[in-house]
From Swiss-Prot:
Cu cation binds at residues 235, 270, 274, 278. It holds the Pfam family COX2_TM. Signal peptide: none annotated. It comes from Rickettsia felis (strain ATCC VR-1525 / URRWXCal2). Residues 6-53 form the RPE1 insert domain. This is Probable cytochrome c oxidase subunit 2. Belongs to the cytochrome c oxidase subunit 2 family. It comes from the Bacteria.
Length: 315
């Protein structure tokens, strides 16, 4: 009723309904008052909705950078780099993004300019020239310069990845359908299989489709060389946060290296289609302190000596 009285006090309502106090008129005025009030609050509600949407998008983008070890739903960026090679790849990606964005904006702006400036309405008589030497030189030289600018850091990263420094630890990796076999030749040829943990055996703190029964364990700040091959078909040994993806080819040994300064567990997966269970070949690399690594080696060797490390049967 207060809404009706307030709106009736406006000049427009006083003139329109002067002297009319019937219930029908009162209901009509009430509906118009409610509609007016609704339109009054429409903008703040929309603003609140957009603020919440922007906040949610920012949360998804930022949260994707808060976890270094695993892929996340709705992740739109790389996993944060955990090795020297991945740090270089991350910077190179951002560098390429700036160049690509500039090219896209330039081409889109040029296309819009041409559509507006040289349409049939503005140019009823079309130009009759067939070529322009200066323009052709420009659009040939500029792409060459861009490619050279891109190639220099690209080759530098490739050289850094291929040139393996003096190593502190070597690990042999053998891919099978559908599990990984690891060998530590520097530690009495310690070897074990690594198999994905099934859903029924998964513990609350373990990650589905990523955790394994036996992880690779390496010490922090140690240069580790991986010698990679396969025993049946082609696989691919890939850990995104460490910046490597190396094919495991039967009869051939490929190699890569890494050095991780931060403790934690870093996950990867087989990245080469290798059969029906290709998607169930995760890789888990745990980085620990030097003391914990030595204790882990001693424990594994003791287990092997006691005969409690059975080989995985072919499946």
């Amino acid at each position: 009723m207060k809404n009706i009285i307030r709106h009736l006090s406006k000049p427009a309502y006083r003139e329109e309904f002067k002297g009319d106090t019937s219930p029908r008129t009162a209901a009509y005025i009430s509906n118009r008052a409610d509609a007016s009030l609704g339109s009054t609050y429409k903008l703040p509600l929309e603003a609140k909705f957009w603020k919440m949407s922007i906040a949610l998008i920012c949360f998804l983008i930022v949260s994707s950078n808060c976890f270094a070890s695993e892929p996340l739903p709705w992740q739109v960026t790389f996993q944060p780099p955990a090795s020297p090679i991945m740090e270089e790849l991350h910077h190179f990606h951002n560098f390429l993004l700036y160049i690509s964005t500039a090219i896209v904006l330039f081409v889109a702006g040029l296309l819009g300019f041409v559509c507006i400036r040289f349409n049939a309405k503005n140019n009823p008589v079309p130009a009759k020239f067939s070529h322009n030497v200066l323009i052709e030189i420009i659009w040939t030289v500029i792409p060459i310069i861009i490619l050279v600018i891109i190639a220099v850091p690209s080759f530098r990263i490739l050289r850094h990845a291929e040139k393996i420094p003096e190593t502190d630890l070597t690990i042999k990796v053998v891919g099978y359908q559908w599990y990984w076999h690891y060998i530590y030749p520097d530690h009495d040829n310690l070897e074990f299989d690594s198999v994905m943990i099934s859903d029924e055996n998964l513990k609350p703190d373990q990650k589905r489709l990523l955790d394994v029964d036996n992880r690779i364990v390496i010490p922090e700040n140690a240069t580790v060389r991986f010698l990679i091959t396969a025993g049946d078909v082609i696989h691919s040994f890939a850990v995104p946060s460490l910046g490597f993806k190396i094919d495991a080819v039967p009869g051939r040994i490929n190699e890569t290296w890494t050095r991780v300064a931060k403790k934690g567990v870093y996950y990867g997966q087989c990245s080469e289609l290798c059969g029906i269970n290709h998607g169930f070949m995760p890789i888990a690399i745990e980085v620990v302190s030097k003391e914990d690594f030595d204790n882990w080696i001693a424990s594994k060797n003791k287990t092997a000596m006691n005969g409690k490390n059975p080989k995985l049967a072919a499946n």
